Amino acid sequence: MKTLGFSPKQKFCARRQTQRWLPEGDRSSSFTPSTMETQRKKFTKVSVNSELLPVDLIMEILKKLSLKPLIRFLCVSKLWASIIRDPYFMKLFLNESLKRPKSLVFVFRAQSLGSIFSSVHLKSTREISSSSSSSSASSITYHVTCYTQQRMTISPSVHGLICYGPPSSLVIYNPCTRRSITLPKIKAGRRAINQYIGYDPLDGNYKVVCITRGMPMLRNRRGLAEEIQVLTLGTRDSSWRMIHDIIPPHSPVSEELCINGVLYYRAFIGTKLNESAIMSFDVRSEKFDLIKVPCNFRSFSKLAKYEGKLAVIFYEKKTSGIIGLWILEDASNGEWSKKTFALPNLAASSTNSRILKLQKFRTTDADTCEIIFTPSYAHSSLSSAIYCDLKENKVRKFVKEGWTENYLPCNADSVSSTQVENLMFL
């Protein structure tokens, strides 16, 4: 049985809340951490509508709810609030949330407004053909103010959390709760910074990685990684820790993907920093490794997830709608396998049509192994996303309702297909 990690204050509140349901002989005048489990086994029941429910059963019920009622249930009692805010329960809720259908998140950066627009789309499961009508999807749009656009970068959603901002004020944002936290400032001076966010499924920890690049010495404006700092979210000492391990010389690129506790990001290596490579960061052990890529690896490809593995997707022949996939089979030995797929007719015609020529593949659906094509700009005529099942040669799409009627002077900085409800309180 899992012992809840309550603080002393929470334990006192829990005792007062639960003591009403304890048998008279079981009530104790003292409450210490060592007796927490014993006391919990003795009562493990709270009164809900005159019914007695074990605490473990309450947790099993609560974790299956959506986030909105859980937020309301914080006001039910101090005991319920302690349960919902407990890290162990938050991990249970996240694991349950990962089993549900994922949402699609667009993050747009509007330079004129100095803001970030994030829209959450509920995917349509209706398969369509090129002659059938599209189905619509509901969405929620958030407007997040960002006071500066200087060197601002945006990391894709990782289990519901988004990291964005300039080096001076990096922000972790939870679209579900609409809460954010500003991380401690990184002193980088005029040097550029790449930030990434990863998740360790074993410990349930989120970690933010910041890599400070040196001043570029070459015409390609790429600088070597000089300093690497890591911050663990949700800890009492939320400060940056310097990584002193020797890492392979590389210049990081702001494109990353976290799969099963390993954060992958693109990089350039070589004396001229013009050779493509992929770096891996084990979120739990905080170890870096260099992954060799195929000799004909294309620099304009996209990191993706395919059948639970890291993959690199690219156009083999764009005019004919041929998609190529490099799939990482063995990271330690740099072994890759290659697959090619012909896009279904609807997707192939969409990528070449005039009205949808701004669409490009942005991500893959980890649950269905589908490639997702999304618009690069926010406009009512470009408000659809196309899902291509390469294995089954099928296509489905949805149309987002309520998109802006005018062009926004912005690009889609990131598109994530794995958005889930996250109970983490920032």
Swiss-Prot record:
Gene3D superfamilies per UniProt: 1.20.1280.50
Pfam families from the UniProt entry: F-box, FBA_3
F-box domain residues: 47-92
SMART domains: FBOX (SM00256)
Residues in coiled coil: none
PANTHER family recorded: BNAA05G37150D PROTEIN-RELATED (PTHR31111), F-BOX ASSOCIATED UBIQUITINATION EFFECTOR FAMILY PROTEIN-RELATED (PTHR31111:SF132)
Protein's name according to its UniProt entry: Putative F-box protein At4g38870
